[in-house]
A protein has these predicted regions:
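Residue-level detector of alpha-helix initiation sites
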Residues: 13, 83-84, 108
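Short hydrophobic core segments
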Residues: 80, 160-169
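Short cysteine clusters
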Residues: 18, 22, 28, 32
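N-terminal Rossmann-like FAD-binding beta1-loop-alpha1 element of flavoenzymes
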Residues: 76-101
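Ferredoxin-type iron-sulfur electron-transfer modules in oxidoreductases and energy-metabolism complexes
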Residues: 1-20, 38-71, 196
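Glycine-rich FAD pyrophosphate-binding loop
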Residues: 98-114
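Glycine-rich dinucleotide-binding loop and its adjacent helix/turn
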Residues: 52-70, 129-149, 173-196
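N-terminal Rossmann-like dinucleotide/flavin-binding domain of flavoprotein oxidoreductases
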Residues: 5-15, 48, 113-161
Length: 196
């Protein structure tokens, strides 16, 4: 089973997340050869990914550090935003041998994973476990840091960053310009998901 974990992690940076919340039935399974050519039920890749990731989470030896952290670093990379794009990019860069720091404006990491997906769909413990795996790769995190205000892009370059990946994720909501949209108790979808 641990071999399956290694195979999945070659191409999926967040398998415990993707196995729970990605629409595999549209993205992967609808294009499965079993469905398209053989007219059979698709391989349930999302369920397999989740099962293998959960097995890893339960049976993982946290005392063993990744071999990747022993490699000499190729350079320093700043990642702005800790949502799925930022975390996936940071994981890949760390695997390839870069020293990666993720900067997050919020007090907790995860971006839309934490603030936009209800916890009954994606428990915070799953997010934390994926973050721990990233820490094992040598990725560091700075929360409560607004790049452009708390620290400037020039400041990042002055700290020796060789590259900056901007993964700021969910933007400002579009309002419809109708009466009452600014009243107390009226929320955008993002505000509602973050609040409740």
């Amino acid at each position: 089973m641990l071999e399956a974990v290694g195979i999945i992690r070659e191409t999926s940076s967040l398998p415990a997340v993707c196995g729970r919340v990605c629409p595999q039935e549209k993205q992967c399974e609808s294009q499965c050869i079993y469905t398209l050519s053989l007219k059979k039920e698709a391989v349930s890749i999302g369920n397999l990914e989740r099962y293998v990731a959960d097995y890893e989470r339960i049976h993982r030896d946290h005392s063993i550090k990744s071999k990747h952290s022993e490699k000499p670093k190729l350079g320093r990379i700043a990642v702005v935003g800790s949502g799925p794009a930022g975390l996936s990019f940071a994981t890949d860069m760390a695997k390839w041998g870069y020293d990666v720091t993720v900067y997050e404006a919020e007090s907790q990491l995860g971006g839309v994973l934490r603030y936009g997906i209800p916890e009954f769909c994606l428990p915070n413990s799953i997010i934390e476990d994926e973050l721990d795996k990233m820490r094992d790769l040598g990725v560091t995190f700075q929360t409560d840091t607004i790049v452009g205000k708390t620290i400037t892009y020039e400041g990042l370059k002055a700290q020796g960053m060789d590259g900056i990946f901007i993964a700021t994720g969910v933007g400002v909501a579009n309002y419809m310009g109708i009466p009452g949209e600014d009243l107390k108790g009226v929320y955008t979808a993002s505000e509602y998901l973050a609040k409740y």
